[in-house]
Amino acid sequence: MHTPLIDLRGIRKSYGGGDSPRVNVLRGIDLSIHAGEFVAIVGASGSGKSTLMNILGCLDRPTSGEYLFAGENVAELGGDELAWLRREAFGFVFQGYHLIPSGSAQENVEMPAIYAGTPAAERHARAAALLDRLGLASRTGNRPHQLSGGQQQRVSIARALMNGGHIILADEPTGALDSHSGAEVMTLLDELASQGHVVILITHDREVAARANRVIEISDGLVISDTARDLSTPRSANPAALQAVDLRKRLSEGSGSHGAWKGELLDAIQAAWRVMWVNRFRTALTLLGIVIGVASVVVMLAVGEGSKRQVMAQMSSFGSNIIYLNGKAPNPRAPKGVITLEEVAALGELPEVKMIMPVNGGQAGVRFGNVDHSSYVGGNDTHFPAIFNWPVAEGSYFSEADEQGAAAVAVIGYKVRQKLFGDRIDPIGQYILIENVPFQVVGVLQEKGATSGDLDSDNRIAIPYSSASIRLFGSQDPEYITIATRDANNVKQAEAAIRTLLQRLHNGKQDYELTNNAAMIQAEARTQNTLSLMLGSIAAISLLVGGIGVMNIMLMTVRERTREIGIRMATGARQRDILRQFLTEAVMLSVVGGLAGIVLALAMGAALLASKVAVAFTLSAVIGAFACALVTGVIFGFMPARKAARLDPVAALTSE
């Protein structure tokens, strides 16, 4: 006697309990089915026949009793092994067809083979052959809504046969069809049974049940009759059908086989893209949050980096070997210290000092014709262009003779030139009024640009130190001293030498302070970095909001596609397959949104550059923003994906 392929012993199934009343749906089912049988299970609505089919197809577990499949106790099988059985042993044909709306007929048929890890070319060919065999060769690209009821049911039969369909579980396969389409479906099931497939037909129609060679009637969860009839033509088991002996080996091998992970991932990506395209309006709205978030982060960081580079370049252009010396009050009650010209001369003798220049200046009103302007006026000596690496663009700098004679000459900055003279008037030789004192313009400095905040280096006027002291400010003592060291790498040593000399000259009083350009550049860099971080953090909030939007949409998608999840599980999807599918969709949303956000950011950057705004895109910022979008997709997509993977197959299939 051969071991039954399916052997049920005392199977019971009940629902409820606890605070709700317990409902006994199956109350002790004993049933054996051998390879090659065509069995019809008949019963009225509510008799338990659909619950029995779910248990037979490993979609549900009994409350008690023993279910042996090819001698293996199904209760001892894990989730992956049950999925393998649904994928390799069973093929489901449902009354409601249960096709995935977003997929074509070909894609619906291929689904079990995807979860089996079948190579793409092989499954494409097999699906096409099955559809051709069932008369749907011209409908392979049609979606379910483009097919009639009979055609949809034939697609579901082809899907059931995709991985062999050794056991066909047909739940009311003709219930939603007209008589002609129903007859066609039953003819197909007859053919499958004659070819050796086990066909288990669930129906309430006794005429349909009469097509089977064995009719089992259940009522109120019990088998009340089991009738077999002789066949005029004996059915022989298909050599390819599952046999109890080889199933044990195939089950242990197959449940551990996951297929090629690259192929599975590619299939998940293709399915995700298909879903996104079908629901493209919703997809676009969901992407908007990610796009705006990524674009905001990239543009904000680019603006911050551009501003930083601009400021750093301008500050560095003045030289990193510059030291500034000015007097200060040693304590709140003491007067501010004064650096005299005699001390300037003494400092100039130090071997570490290359050049030294006293500066006497301040903000002053400037006029040319009827144009008034406010500018910084600095009394310098002839070392100014060399110390600051700031050549003259037009005319010439004032001479040593001008300094000695306190000449009323001026070299103006680029911004002063534009404000007073514009582009039409040549400023060289023109007279301007500085605090109502006439000065002749002898030169125009090259454009430097703003360094930080409101400080604009081009909004200045250089005049001889002697002229500033005598004609404008009335003081011989400098406002501060500018010192250029011989070696930019030894600024600290130069500072130490200057301090030592000043300590001696000032009798130990700390009524002065030293700052150097390098330290100022570093401080400004830290400020700019902090500003960039703040801008990026503000922009990142929009990316976070976009991620929450992805999670909300995915949670709604899981609810809307609950039946699809049940279909995938019925065709052999494991929990991790469902998890991967929905997580891939979330990540795909983030990837597409991230790429679109980068493109938008580059376009916005180009517009800002055209508007003369300093922008500097960095690869790290672009990659970082894209990576954040990707991580956002994983984090906010995981919870919906996990929820989808944990759905009960039966509950998912019966959801509306």
UniProtKB/Swiss-Prot annotation:
EC annotation? 7.6.2.-
Source organism: Pseudomonas syringae pv. tomato (strain ATCC BAA-871 / DC3000)
Any one biological process term the GO annotation gives: xenobiotic transport
Pfam families according to UniProt: ABC_tran, FtsX, MacB_PCD
The protein's name is: Pyoverdine export ATP-binding/permease protein PvdT
Q: Which Gene3D superfamilies match?
A: P-loop containing nucleotide triphosphate hydrolases
Question: What are the binding positions for ATP in this chain?
Answer: 43-50
How it assembles, according to the record, is: Part of the tripartite efflux system PvdRT-OpmQ, which is composed of an inner membrane component with both ATPase and permease domains, PvdT, a periplasmic membrane fusion protein, PvdR, and an outer membrane component, OpmQ.
Q: Where is the ABC transporter domain?
A: 6-245
Which UniProt keywords are listed? ATP-binding, Cell inner membrane, Cell membrane, Membrane, Nucleotide-binding, Translocase, Transmembrane, Transmembrane helix, Transport
Q: Which domain of life is it from?
A: Bacteria
Tell me one GO molecular function of this protein.
ABC-type xenobiotic transporter activity
Entry membrane topology: Multi-pass membrane protein
